[in-house]
């Protein structure tokens, strides 16, 4: 097989190549049962998000793509660039992945450590990591539970959501959807509070922490986003008038676009982001906010509830297992040298 490798600083400006890459990604997902690229990297293909790409082509089609998240900036700042890649199933183990990595060195000038996501940690990814002497540095579990209408688990979650609402109200807090909060407090304040709580909750997180309002709005700029699927818990009683309203936490739920077309009760929805402000910790609000969001997903026709949790967060994994969640698959970061 003759294969050529092309570097793109602005892949989104090449619509024919973008279309061919998406064809490849659909082929890979159908074969592997898991998407090769995550949401952020998909957005980096379709829009200007500072990503770089190596695309592997034969005369007939695109057979591989390597996506790099701000690689040059990361290298200059001393951080490790992060990558995700996909190779067509029928040309694996023929040097396509190695060729794309070599092109990243030669055409984009990348050297040093590279963190590469392997979604599902499938055998081809493990083989490539072993050949490159790469090591696991991070695991992210996808967990899911059947909460279909009429099931014991579904009824448990419905009751749990009602109890959670009572717990929140008993602490003098108010649950508002994002549009309700904007109507009451104004978009600027609500977005500032959203970012504040996010950054307090994810101060440790390599991707989710350190956001600004522009990053928040970019994250919301996606086809599946429903502002009514964001539940925010507010302290806004009379005793808070001097300081103004404060967000104690929020639960951002997600129902993917394709799932929205499924019949009610058969949709998959995600516990996408749950955050608690520092000042709200130690009051039992974290589990309550989580359950409020699960209840909202079920009201919107979700029968399978999904979430992602860090593999080294044993207490969280145990908590979700106690709620009936099981690990569906694990995404892994492998760190290897580009030199």
From Swiss-Prot:
Classification lineage: Bacteria, Bacillati, Actinomycetota, Actinomycetes, Mycobacteriales
This protein's encoding gene: mshD
Entry annotated with the keyword Transferase: yes
Annotated source species: Corynebacterium urealyticum (strain ATCC 43042 / DSM 7109)
UniProt keyword list: Acyltransferase, Repeat, Transferase
Keyword Acyltransferase: yes
Subunit structure: Monomer.
One GO BP: mycothiol biosynthetic process
Pfam families documented for this protein: Acetyltransf_1, Acetyltransf_7
PROSITE patterns for this protein: GNAT (PS51186)
Its job: Catalyzes the transfer of acetyl from acetyl-CoA to desacetylmycothiol (Cys-GlcN-Ins) to form mycothiol.
Reaction equations catalysed: 1D-myo-inositol 2-(L-cysteinylamino)-2-deoxy-alpha-D-glucopyranoside + acetyl-CoA = mycothiol + CoA + H(+)
Molecular function as annotated in GO: mycothiol synthase activity; protein-N-terminal-alanine acetyltransferase activity
Residues that, per the record, bind 1D-myo-inositol 2-(L-cysteinylamino)-2-deoxy-alpha-D-glucopyranoside: 39, 207, 254, 270, 308
Family: Belongs to the acetyltransferase family. MshD subfamily.
Protein name: Mycothiol acetyltransferase
Residues of the N-acetyltransferase domain: 8-174, 176-339
């Amino acid at each position: 097989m003759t294969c050529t490798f092309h570097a793109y600083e602005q892949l989104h400006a090449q619509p024919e190549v973008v279309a061919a890459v998406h064809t490849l990604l659909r082929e890979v997902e159908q074969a592997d049962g898991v998407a090769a690229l995550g949401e952020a990297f998909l957005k980096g293909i379709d829009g200007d998000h500072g990503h770089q790409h190596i695309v592997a082509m034969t005369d007939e089609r695109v057979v591989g793509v390597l996506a790099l998240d701000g690689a040059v900036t990361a290298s200059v700042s001393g951080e490790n660039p992060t990558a995700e890649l996909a190779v067509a199933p029928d040309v694996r183990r023929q040097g396509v992945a190695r060729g794309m990595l070599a092109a990243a060195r030669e055409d984009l000038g990348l050297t040093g450590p590279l963190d590469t996501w392997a979604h599902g940690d499938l055998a081809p990814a493990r083989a490539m990591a072993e050949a490159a002497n790469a090591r696991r540095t991070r695991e992210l579990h996808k967990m899911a539970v059947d909460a279909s209408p009429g099931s014991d688990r579904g009824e448990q979650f419905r009751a749990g959501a009602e109890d959670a609402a009572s717990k929140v109200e008993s602490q003098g807090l108010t649950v508002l959807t994002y549009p309700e909060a904007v109507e009451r407090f104004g978009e600027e304040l609500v977005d500032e509070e959203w970012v504040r709580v996010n950054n307090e909750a994810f101060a440790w997180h390599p991707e989710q922490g350190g956001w600004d309002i522009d990053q928040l709005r970019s994250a919301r700029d996606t086809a599946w986003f429903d502002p009514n699927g964001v539940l925010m818990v507010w302290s806004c009683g009379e005793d808070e008038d001097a300081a103004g309203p404060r967000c104690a936490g929020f639960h951002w739920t997600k129902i993917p676009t394709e799932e929205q077309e499924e019949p009610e009760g058969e949709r998959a929805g995600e516990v996408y982001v749950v955050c608690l402000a520092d000042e709200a910790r130690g009051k039992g609000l974290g589990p309550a906010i989580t359950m409020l969001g699960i209840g909202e997903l079920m009201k919107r026709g979700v029968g399978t509830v999904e979430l992602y949790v860090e593999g080294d967060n044993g207490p969280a994994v145990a908590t979700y297992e106690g709620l009936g969640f099981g690990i569906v698959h694990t995404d892994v970061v492998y760190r290897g040298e580009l030199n």
